[in-house]
């Protein structure tokens, strides 16, 4: 897969050097390249070049200019509409600031509806109290009639509710309207089909399941429960709102089945209606317009597939596909197949996703995969870590003249970046893959300059490349750019929704601003940083210019920031354009870590939750047993974590990356400090729980000998003397600190063993060995599948062998291998270091034993694979 080699500069003297890279190609044939991206969504007046003469003989140039003008007109109309909404809302807020509740209601309607005239307060009161009150009511009523027909308004009988619910078309509340109609005795009876279709069926959206059921009942009542008159628009309205419902994540909840049951009942209703129609021979009436024609269509199938994909339920997906194909002769279209491919990808059924993709290519021209489909399949290549197939797919798009979108390029870049981080999947071409990804990204200048509409997705793709390359300078610049931009946007959105006079909930603003994926990529860039290595992006001219522009465009000193948010909008980053010292990496990584966990510095992790000591003591005093106390404490810690700590940033993956930073930089003290501060062991937790529980119960018995407690003196004496005892203060402090700690799992113990190897610390290795032995007895480990437990045991045992090999304790290393050969499949990469040392020592006996164990397992594995293939 190797293509041409790039010419590299000669290595310079000193620690810095430039790297030679190779660009992998998907095939031997050289493919022509072309610019991608098409017409940008954000077209400015300058880019239209209105004064430039057009070549009327060139149809491509005319088509290009026409597309530009259409996009510019569309953007201009959108900007005008947004500006009008902002002006109206700001005017309403200013005018309504100091009014009474009655004045607020009247003036809000007048300002929003555009009937506000700039008289002073006395004149407005005169209008309300004087003879012009009727004209104001008539004006408001006239505006309300534009939202709903008069027949429906009379049944709602609340113009203020209609205005409040529907005046903002971006955030309309149809649930309130449906609920009010349902409370009316007339409901929707007698309302014409035309009025229903134009004002409700085509506009009502974001309905809850309860509102959908109410609307369905009212629609049935409107047609006197004659199922043959339940038309297509009604079906589309119900299925559309059902498909937009958010599924419940609670496995015990029946909500998802309720939604699915409603969909099934609608399909059964349609089938029943078709039987009635066939029996009454009403086809002629339908043709004459007496009875509406009812039929299932592609839109309804789209809704069913959409909701089934949200549920991640294969049986329900197959049920809908089979039903529409067999009974209604409706096959999925291109968009449906793309959703189904995404559905199979989420479930991990990769083979079925590829089958769907192959089917689309050979069905018909209408089913031909588009850029969205190719983007979906590139994301699947990312999960499979198959860079060759990803490159082939992209070249296939070019050959078939399918213009790649920014999303397509980002998906390809993420795939190449992910594969480059895996030494096995990258086949030794990690740097070449990352350089190739940067070159693909530069095919669209709007992407690398962050001018496209895919701001977040593009930064995510670029940061993935920086993370695996260790380019901390560019990664921190991109992270800074994203956070400051996103914070400003979220802050302005909050002001628009809540008004300038309400206090800002900075915790919610920061929670929606801090992206855990970008945060982990930044930590990974810190971890992979090496002072003596030049960033790979400097390997070609365009990349060097892009990197320089992005870094220089960041204002770490906030000299040019004019932000109402004040100091809360500032990130704890060093005021340096680039980082050159390991100490700077350690300091900044810790500061950014704390900043993310503390919701932008709004909380302090070092401070225990308010009243935590009293809460824990009360729980211990009221608990009936240690198990009951442990359960209640874990529940309380979960509440603290939700309220105080950004749990999106604190997860097992991010803490592994965070601990890797000092490990790779050789900072033992910082590694141990971070591990103890942000992780805990299950056995330590149980010891503190037991100690606090026993101390609290003993204090109760001592203070009130005659009191009724759940623990007696004899039970206290029965407690094992070997149980580690902590004083009350230390137990309370430990349990309170668990709000920002992650329980240690096999991955953390493996990282600890790597640290012992890195720092040549025998005490740390011994402690890790003993602690993991205790961890293996916990339910968290025992509940894992047998294959996964064996895999984790093998990984840790391999690290132990490497440690003993480094310490020249070859007998102990051989002892581990021989003792575990019945449970662990030892392969040569796991014992490579030990084998090399034994060869140097010419220990032929140990070499023979070692290779027999390795070869025996290899032969048995090969035999098992052969039997499986024959079966």
Swiss-Prot record:
Main location: mitochondrion
Keyword Repeat among UniProt keywords: yes
Pfam families, per database record: PPR_2
Keyword annotations: Mitochondrion, mRNA processing, mRNA splicing, Repeat, Transit peptide
Listed name of the protein: Mitochondrial 15S rRNA processing factor CCM1
GO cellular component: mitochondrion
Family: Belongs to the CCM1 family.
Subcellular location: Mitochondrion
Function: Regulates mitochondrial small subunit maturation by controlling 15S rRNA 5'-end processing. Localizes to the 5' precursor of the 15S rRNA in a position that is subsequently occupied by mS47 in the mature yeast mtSSU. Uses structure and sequence-specific RNA recognition, binding to a single-stranded region of the precursor and specifically recognizing bases -6 to -1. The exchange of Ccm1 for mS47 is coupled to the irreversible removal of precursor rRNA that is accompanied by conformational changes of the mitoribosomal proteins uS5m and mS26.
Subunit structure: Binds to mitochondrial small subunit 15S rRNA.
Coiled coil residues, start to end: none
Encoding gene per record: CCM1
General remark: Involved in mitochondrial-nuclear incompatibility, a major determinant in reproductive isolation between species, through hybrid incompatibility of Ccm1 and its interacting partner 15S rRNA between yeast species.
Transit peptide, from-to: 1-72
